[in-house]
Every structure is written in C-alpha cells, then in structure tokens.
Amino acid sequence: MKIISINAGSSSLKFSLFNMDDKKVIASGLFERIGIDGSSYTIKYNGEKIKIEAELATHTDAVKILLDKLVSLNIIKSLDEIDGVGHRLVHGKDKYKESCLITDEVVNDLTLFKDFAPLHNPANVLGIEAFKEVLPDVPMVGVFDTAFHQTMDEEAYLYPVPYSWYSEHGVRKYGFHGTSHRYIAKTISEKLGRDNLRIISCHVGNGGSITAIKDGKCIETSMGFTPLAGIMMGTRSGDVDPSIITYVMEQEGLNAKEVIDILNKKSGLLGLSEISSDMRDIVGVINNDDEQGKKARRAFLKYTRTVTNYIAQYYVLLGGADVICFTAGLGENSEPFRKKVCENLACLGVKIDSEANKVMGEFKKISSDDSTISVYVVPTDEELMIALDTLKLIS
C-alpha cells in the first residue's frame, strides 16, 4: 500500500511517498515558487536527486507533474498504486480533535477558519483541491497541527481575558506542532515499552514549542492562539508583555500589523543577536571576544532560558517527568543548545552524558545513568505520522 503525505504552502508543495508495508519513503520532493517566476521542483528517489525548472502556475500544475514523474521515473507503475493522500492541515480550531477523512465540510471549515491561520489554511485548501481534481477517486485524510492539543482542559487553554472573547470569537490557546509532538510521544513510548509516561517534548527548530504529555495526551503546550506565543524562536519573540505593542506603535509610528510582523519575522534569535536566526551562526561566534560574541551570548542565554523555564513549569504540572525529548532542527542537531538547557535543569537532577550528547539526527539517550530524568534525542517524522493516520482511516 502506498500513501502520499502532502504539505501545501501558499507557493510550495512538499511531498513524501511511503510504502506502508515497511513504512519507508520511496520518493520525496518539493515544488517551489508556485505561481511565481522561477518555479522549480526537486524529486529524490532511489539514491538520486533531480531538480528541474518548470512553469508552475497553480498547485494543480505541480500535482500533475508530480504524479506524471512518479510514473515516468518508474517510482510507481501506475497511479492506481496510490491508495491514499494525507494532508497536513494547520488549523482546525477546537472542532477537529483528531485526523479525519476530508469531506466538503472539512474544506468549508478550513476556509471558515482562515482568520486563525491566514497563510496556511487557504494554502491547505489549494493542495486538497489540486489532488481532488487529479485523483478524484483516491481518499484523502486531513491531519491537523492543532488536533493533538485538544485534550487540554479549560484551565490550560483559556486566557484570563473576558470570557466572551472565547465564547464569541474563539480566543483561546490552540497550540501547534501537534503532529510532531504526537509522533514523539508515540515513538518514545514504543522505544521504552511504556504508555504511562510523563513526557516533556521539546520541538525546537526555527519555530519551537514545548508540550507536556501524560499517558499519551497533551496536558499543556507553549504556543497559544497563534504560533507567536511561548519560547523564543528563530525570528519570533515568543511571550512578551502585550503592552509593548501599543508602546512601540507610538514610539516608532507603526500600526499593530507592522509590530506583529516584527515580532514574527525580526525578533527572537535574529532580533536579540542582530546576527542571524540560525543557532549554528550564533554558536559559531559565541566564544569571540568582541561585539559579535557578546551579541551571540545574550541571544543564546535568553533562548535557552526560555526553553528551560517551560520545561521546569511542565515538570511541576506533570508532578515530575519520566523523559525529556529534544526534536526538530535545533533539538536534534545542536549539542551546545541541549547541553546548556540540561545544565540549567541540574537542580531537578538532570545530568547529561557529554559524549552521547554529540549525536546529531539520531534516536539516542543523552542523559547519564544517574540522571533523575531520562533525556533523549528523538528525530521527528511528521510526514510518516500523516501517512500512518491516512492508512488507519482508509483501511
């Protein structure tokens, strides 16, 4: 059985084709700059990689080329081999608590909820409509980023604002990266042979969120009404005093949208360091005895402190923790980042194994044997999680 996992952006379409018999990727790729000059696509398969410039006016054009190439490159013999298509969907509000078969109602809801994810939900609809046109008889499944967090109770998801903001306008914590956090919880539970774990999952890439998981369910998460809340990130501020917005509007002569744009795109590591949004660039100059080194250190220390603070908060919320998991670009690959966060948690009995912590992108325990909390690097695989959900729902 073969399933395609799809992540459709406003001008891009990322795919992975899985053979569900062994859960392996047969082919993957990316269609870029859809509807923009200079569009192209990349396909990786069988140890090879091709990149071709092509006119991609619409997402449907991209899907047609994708399916044509899967056959012409002998990746599959015919389109009949494709049993299902799983779509990453960003925002399902509190209506969608788990993955579901995509129906007209789902598509209508994605459009209805577009104000909650104005960049992503309309793009997700474009991806769905493209596959619907080209593969009309193949079932499609929607996997929502927000779904995993719908097990939070009111105490966790309500904001201390007028209740009517929630009841009338849907203002509440939704959380994101849910598919990744769910994959981490599933993987670590399977590896350790336990379902009743208290897990603190740290998805830290250019965007980042921390999630408290108990018995496989989300109890609390750091991102909120939007992905701007929570820990400091590559270009996002994370939590700030909301009064800063009106103050900066007055001081800089900006409107609210412009300030929010700065908090989303010019803050975080980039804003504090004035060097880069990439932790590798920060770590590269952090020991310099100059102004750049000073800037890098202040950004690194603030970043790791915000992550530490959420882990410590969730340790208390869960009544302790059995395991801390690091995942995504930074979590999987940055030895200095993990080392500093774990050093900050020493008062909880967390101890790092320096040699094990050198691991990059592999599943590995990085805490020492006498650490009171086990710490693991767990590579995430949202595409596989989408494929697994699709398989389950179409079987």
Walk through the language-model features, giving the residues of each.
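Extreme N-terminal starter segment of soluble prokaryotic enzymes
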Residues: 1-4
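Phosphate/pyrophosphate-binding loops at sites that engage ATP/ADP/AMP, CoA/4′-phosphopantetheine
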Residues: 68-83, 188-193, 311-322
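Glycine-rich phosphate-binding loops at beta-strand->alpha-helix junctions
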Residues: 322-345
